């Protein structure tokens, strides 16, 4: 069975990004997407789709096409409750609230990895122990928070 990956909004966003200010992240995202993605069972959520739709940026249609066919995880009342716990226990900020929802989705559905370029709120080593403590209290799995270059298979 392939490892599971929850793909957060920044991944398709960076894949489709045309700016030169994030060229390394864009390159690494495209490398992972084109070379590594098929070695994983990938998932997005309605939250990812809503964020992609709501944005005002060039390449929106390309981003939406990119995630077509990827399994969509449902945002349930339990997910929102978990996100609220993350906020109340100061693991995640209240704004943007979607960041805590992404983490709740990956935890609730037992994803092995949460793939993101959000290094401030998600792929941040300073949050790992806090996440482990909260998720153990809640009886949830603990996803590995990773960026695309951290999730490349090296032979």
Regions found by a protein language model. Give the residues of each.
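Short leucine-rich amphipathic alpha-helices used at interfaces
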Residues: 57, 93, 99, 143-144, ...
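General small-molecule cofactor/ligand-binding pocket signal
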Residues: 43, 73, 146
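Active-site neighborhoods of divalent-metal-dependent phosphate/nucleic-acid chemistry enzymes
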Residues: 71-130, 152
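Acidic, PIN/NYN-like endoribonuclease modules and their adjacent C-terminal/linker elements
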Residues: 1-4, 18-20, 26-27, 109-155
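Residues at the C-termini of beta-strands that transition into short coil/loop
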Residues: 46, 76, 148-149
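Surface-exposed charge patches
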Residues: 65, 104, 133
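Short secondary-structure boundary segments
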Residues: 9, 46, 117-119
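Short, well-structured N-terminal submotif of metal-dependent ribonuclease cores
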Residues: 1-44, 51-64, 70, 88-94, ...
């Amino acid at each position: 069975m392939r490892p599971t990956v929850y793909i957060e909004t920044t991944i398709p966003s960076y894949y489709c990004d045309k700016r030169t200010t994030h060229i390394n992240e864009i390159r690494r995202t495209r490398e992972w997407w084109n070379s590594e993605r098929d070695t994983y069972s990938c998932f997005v959520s309605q939250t990812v789709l809503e964020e992609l739709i709501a944005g005002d940026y060039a390449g929106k249609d390309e981003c939406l096409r990119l995630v077509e066919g990827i399994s969509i995880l449902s945002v349930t009342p339990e997910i929102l409750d978990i996100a609220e716990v993350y906020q109340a226990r100061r693991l995640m900020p209240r704004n943007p609230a979607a960041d805590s929802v992404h983490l709740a989705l990956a935890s609730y559905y037992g994803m092995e990895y949460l793939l993101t370029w959000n290094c401030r709120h998600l792929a941040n080593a300073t949050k790992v122990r806090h996440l482990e403590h909260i998720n153990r209290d809640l009886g949830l799995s603990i996803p590995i928070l990773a960026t695309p270059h951290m999730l490349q298979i090296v032979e």
